[in-house]
Amino acid sequence: MKILVVCSGGLDSVSLADKMAAEHELIGLISFDYGQRHKKELDFAALAAKRLGVPHQIIDMTNIGASLTGSALTDDLDVPDGHYAEETMKITVVPNRNAIMLAIAFGVAAAKKADAVALAVHGGDHFIYPDCRPGFIDAFQIMQAHALEGYADVKLLAPFVTVSKADIVTEGAKYGTPFDQTWSCYKGGARHCGRCGTCVERREAFHLAGVTDPTDYEDPDFWVSATSGFQAREV
């Protein structure tokens, strides 16, 4: 199958790109600039595309992102520290983000005669993000079948949707993903902060997978206290 991967430049989507390149015909990576404070992630998506020898397209959604207010990822709000599953992390929701991005990705995929769009949502996303859950994935596929009926048959692949981030680390290691060439931190500083929800989840995932974490964190040990009382699991 010819696959277009939605790639932010993060650990999950870069690992997915490597998996798709190994198992199918990867025709390109598509990324989105929606005004996120951690825009440097897009540089890591570009690195992945160059390494894999495929085109990389960045869709400018900054005008749209400016209207999706109330998120710490796009507004002048503090990104909270702590575990990814805490209620405080809801401030990182960008409303309807995946639905908007996927609608664009499906249009691009149809135009490029791709067979599928691949997305790296995973079980750990379910706590906070409704557009990362299996129900959303299934419903979006049905909607797109109607939207492209008679024009194109594009599938939505979400192979990580029911597994943990630790499982993604295992998959990435299997396919040789250079984890030091991925970006997760929502704060978008010079180094991974080690304290925001996505840094904590990243650090925990390497630990649970038994894979060496090459990431340079400002606070490499915060994850231990942040994850106490939580149990990473498949959802």
Curated annotation (Swiss-Prot):
It comes from the Bacteria. SUPFAM superfamilies: Adenine nucleotide alpha hydrolases-like. It is an enzyme of class 6 (ligase). Its EC number is 6.3.4.20. The keyword Nucleotide-binding applies. One of its GO terms (molecular function) is ligase activity, forming carbon-nitrogen bonds. Zn(2+) binds at C185, C193, C196, C199. Its cofactor is Zn(2+). One of its GO terms (biological process) is queuosine biosynthetic process. Binds 1 zinc ion per subunit. Keywords: ATP-binding, Ligase, Metal-binding, Nucleotide-binding, Queuosine biosynthesis, Zinc. It catalyses: 7-carboxy-7-deazaguanine + NH4(+) + ATP = 7-cyano-7-deazaguanine + ADP + phosphate + H2O + H(+). InterPro entries: QueC (IPR018317), Rossmann-like_a/b/a_fold (IPR014729). Pathway: Purine metabolism; 7-cyano-7-deazaguanine biosynthesis. The keyword Protease does not apply. ATP binds at C7, S8, G9, G10, L11, D12, S13, V14, S15, L16, A17. Belongs to the QueC family. HAMAP family: QueC. Catalyzes the ATP-dependent conversion of 7-carboxy-7-deazaguanine (CDG) to 7-cyano-7-deazaguanine (preQ(0)). NCBIfam families: 7-cyano-7-deazaguanine synthase QueC (TIGR00364). This is 7-cyano-7-deazaguanine synthase. It comes from Allorhizobium ampelinum (strain ATCC BAA-846 / DSM 112012 / S4). The gene is queC.
